[in-house]
Amino acid sequence: MVKLTSIAAGVAAIAAGVAAAPATTTLSPSDERVNLVELGVYVSDIRAHLAQYYLFQAAHPSETYPVEIAEAVFNYGDFTTMLTGIPAEQVTRVITGVPWYSTRLRPAISSALSKDGIYTIAN
């Protein structure tokens, strides 16, 4: 015989799981919310692999980055507000312009978007 407390605990656990699941949203890849997730991953990657980014910059001096990204890398507080307003094309250019985009950044961005319940559609 199953106790009512067991059933109640099971229902509560299911309800908590449903409440904790993020809502899903489908957005354009150029949506600012998508860009902010991408830039958050990018800033974290720069922090984790700073020497690699310095070497890339030295080898490609014509590659420029928005000043907001540099400020966010070295500001260890909440940097997301610094990154608003960067045009989507510029976000795409800087993120996809590094050789490790497909092996390290793209999977991390996909994971972060999915974790936030965001899916993108083609423009």
Curated annotation (Swiss-Prot):
Alphabetical UniProt keywords: Signal
GO biological process, one term: fungal-type cell wall organization
Signal peptide boundaries: 1-20
GO annotations of cellular component type: fungal-type cell wall; fungal-type vacuole
InterPro entries: SRP1_TIP1 (IPR000992), Yeast_SRP1/TIP1_CWP (IPR050788)
Molecular function GO terms recorded: structural constituent of cell wall
Translocase among keywords: no
Family: Belongs to the SRP1/TIP1 family. Seripauperin subfamily.
Entries under PANTHER family matching the protein: CELL WALL PROTEIN CWP1-RELATED, SERIPAUPERIN
Protein name from the UniProt record: Seripauperin-16
Taxonomic source organism: Saccharomyces cerevisiae (strain ATCC 204508 / S288c) (Baker's yeast)
Primary gene name: PAU16
